[in-house]
Design a protein with these regions (language model features):
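Structured catalytic-domain cores with a bias toward divalent-metal coordination
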Residues: 1-223
Length: 223
């Protein structure tokens, strides 16, 4: 049937374009979050009944079963694996990383050069495109107390010279990656640098994502 494509952030347009390209080529179902009419194109979803806008990728918790069940309904009907698609800020927060602290400061944790007790990077050795960009990578999750090699397709992607970050999960952070791991669902997240809405830049980001998708599906999914 094809993958379940997940695009939880409405401001990550390359992820949405990659999902559309993916479903045309590989089939499956796209689940994308619309952040709301008044606040369209935002990371947080304002289309809530009450309270503040939420991060749609931090709502996969036991207290909200209806949300997860709705988002993942097609997985139960055979749309798999889950392929999450994201874009991220350039670089990483060197103040919170345990490695490469002399790099140019950036934002967040999404980089093959970031590491801590949770995020453990396995960089591409050749750095061939699309992995010439440190912000272009695959995330795979593994359960604390086991081995990174138990992550879904993680070892295969690392052996194929992807940039791979192995995420150690002890307690869920409410993300889809954690939820999928703790429930035994096949899941991988592909990330690339956010390059804006200029058509050429948007295409560049989308193409990095689709390059990872195409290779990973050949490597990880039996047809």
């Amino acid at each position: 049937r094809g993958p379940l494509w997940s695009v939880p952030h409405d401001n990550e347009n390359a992820g949405f374009e990659a999902a559309l390209a993916g479903v045309r080529k590989h089939g499956g179902v796209v689940i994308a979050v619309d952040s709301g009419l008044a606040e369209d194109g935002k990371r947080r979803n304002a289309a809530v009944d009450r309270g503040r806008p939420i991060d749609p990728n931090r709502n996969f918790r036991d207290g909200y079963p209806r949300y997860a069940n709705t988002v993942l309904a097609d997985y139960r009907d055979g749309a798999r694996p889950i392929i999450a698609l994201h874009t991220n800020s350039r670089g990483f927060d060197t103040g919170t990383s345990r490695c490469n602290q002399s790099d140019r400061p950036g934002r967040g944790e999404v980089s093959i050069r970031f590491c801590d007790d949770v995020m453990q990077p396995h960089p591409s050795q050749s750095r061939d495109w699309p992995f010439d960009d440190d912000d272009t990578l695959a995330y795979v999750a593994w359960r604390n107390g086991t081995s990174p090699s138990t992550s879904w397709c993680g070892r295969t992607l690392a052996n194929a010279d992807f940039n791979v970050v192995f995420e150690r999960v002890a307690v869920t952070d409410g993300s889809l990656s954690n939820y999928a791991l703790l429930r035994g669902l096949d899941y991988v997240n592909f990330e690339t640098q956010e390059r804006g809405l200029d058509p050429a830049a948007l295409a560049q980001a989308r193409n990095r994502l689709t390059a990872m998708i195409d290779r990973a599906l050949k490597l990880c999914v039996r047809r």
